[in-house]
UniProtKB/Swiss-Prot annotation:
Keywords: Cytoplasm, Elongation factor, Protein biosynthesis. The keyword Protein biosynthesis applies. It is found in: Cytoplasm. This is Elongation factor Ts. The gene is tsf. GO terms for cellular component: cytoplasm. Residues 79-82 are annotated as: Involved in Mg(2+) ion dislocation from EF-Tu. The lineage of its organism: Bacteria, Bacillati, Bacillota, Bacilli, Bacillales. Belongs to the EF-Ts family. It comes from Brevibacillus brevis (strain 47 / JCM 6285 / NBRC 100599).
Length: 295
């Protein structure tokens, strides 16, 4: 039978489950709302939806490469215990592989896609893991990159996946260089690949701050502008990847390293688990007991 959009909407509101899960449940129960709710509960989907409101600030990053396409993903869970769970770790790797193979435009689109191109949706697979593992799991973000045959990816995971970096180079196939730059980005935490990525508004805002700092220091107005330009160069050196001193040879900037290799930096993505997420503070004993109580 045909399932109305209104019925799907109502079931989503009552259970918090994903759209495709709700539609499938209604189809399997011939549109019976209460039976559909029970079916979602039996499958753990409604239970998973309730957990989705809990803060997930732990987790892992993972990378995947397939030919000329690569991705880095961040998937969050609630505790470090689950972050070290092999089942969760496999899920994160599978999600990275899904992103590479299906090339979604957004997390929302990825969740509605058949997992790795077949069967249940990725969102459904994640909900099943939530029900099995007993914690909220959130596919937070991803970055996709493409290269030519004359390019190379540098995929680097730091601290077992607490930081994940994907660097894309063109004009070289030097895998060691690409990986070294991934390691560099993990350590130096740049915000931009090159100066061109820094918006005019951001540069002007930084220039204004530096100008006010110089004036507050009592510097003569006629030398303030030179001071501002000098300090602005330090801003670029701190936040722009190609302007930074290379971590393995601080006498050499990344831009020089790339030039020597005849390579160009197409782009990079750096994900650190939980950055920007407000984490609920619990002591270690409380975290242990929370896990014990789930058993």
């Amino acid at each position: 039978m045909a399932i109305s959009a209104q019925a799907v909407k109502e079931l989503r509101e009552r259970t918090g489950a994903g759209m495709m899960d709700c539609k499938r449940a209604l189809e399997e129960t011939a549109g019976d709302m209460e039976k559909a709710i029970d079916l979602l509960r039996e499958r753990g989907v409604a239970k998973a939806a309730k957990k989705s409101g809990r803060i997930a600030a732990e987790g892992l990053t993972a990378t995947a490469v397939a030919g000329n396409v690569a991705a880095v993903v961040e998937v969050n869970c609630e505790t470090d215990f689950v972050g070290k769970n092999p089942e969760f770790q496999t899920l994160v790797k599978d999600i990275a592989e899904h992103v590479v193979s299906q090339r979604p435009a957004s997390v929302e689109e990825a969740l509605e896609q058949p997992f790795k191109g077949a069967g249940e949706t990725l969102g459904h697979v994640i909900n099943e893991k939530i029900a099995t593992i007993g914690e909220n799991i959130s596919f937070r973000r991803f970055a996709l990159s493409e290269k030519t045959d004359n390019g190379v990816f540098g995929a680097y995971l730091h601290m077992g996946g607490r930081i994940g970096v994907l660097v894309t180079l063109e004009g070289t196939q030097d895998e060691t260089l690409a990986r070294d730059l991934g390691m560099h980005a993990a350590a130096s935490n740049p915000r931009f690949a090159n100066r061109e990525e820094v918006s005019a508004d951001e540069i002007e805002r930084e220039r204004e701050v530096l100008k006010n700092q110089a004036l507050a220091e009592g510097k003569p107005a006629n030398i303030v502008e030179k001071m501002v330009e000098g300090r602005l160069s330090k801003f670029f050196e701190e936040y722009v990847l190609v302007e930074q001193p290379f971590v393995k040879d601080t006498d050499k900037k990344v831009a020089v390293l790339l030039k020597e290799a005849g390579a160009t930096l197409k782009g990079f993505a750096r994900f650190q688990v939980g950055e920007g997420i407000e984490k609920k503070q619990e002591d270690f004993a409380a975290e242990v007991m929370a896990q014990v109580n789930k058993q």
